[in-house]
Amino acid sequence: MNRFFIRAWRAAKLDASLYDEVMADTKAMTQAIIVVFLYGAAVAYGTFGRTGVAGINGAIFITLIGWYVWAFTTYIVGVRLFPETETTADRKAFMRTMAFASSPGWLRLLGLVPGLGGAIFVGASVWMVVAAVVAVKKALSYKSTQRAAAITVVCWILSLLLQGSMYIIYFSAFGVTKSPF
């Protein structure tokens, strides 16, 4: 378990060598799934003060779906639409790197602190995107940081649009009137 938290911390510190390590370690998939689940739980509980109990399960589910859409579309766009000449990637290895890049999202749990929710959400989001750029650059063997950043940000925005739509539908169905963010 100690190795798990060290890896998550290294991802949050933007340690590029971590992504090589995670790509090579096929046994890290369980750890990667736990990182993403903890991210989803942090989002859910970090927004609890604004969404209540009705929001917890929905927030976890929507966050996990949003993360998957972000990671998978980034993989498809990076490998199929805009590869560099050296780009080769294994889908599972790529998903592991993107999972660890979501570790800064654990900070969203601090959204429970009154008045900090919005700032924490924005700060953690930016940090996650930067970590994902490092992960994408390593996982897809990109030489260009700009290419990795452009693909990561565009796919992240697509994921945000999907998540926003899902939140609107879910919270409308359960009568949650406050924004979770």
Feature-to-residue mapping (PLM):
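Selected alpha-helical membrane-embedding segments in polytopic membrane proteins
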Residues: 1-89
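Juxtamembrane boundary at the C-terminal end of a transmembrane helix
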Residues: 161-181
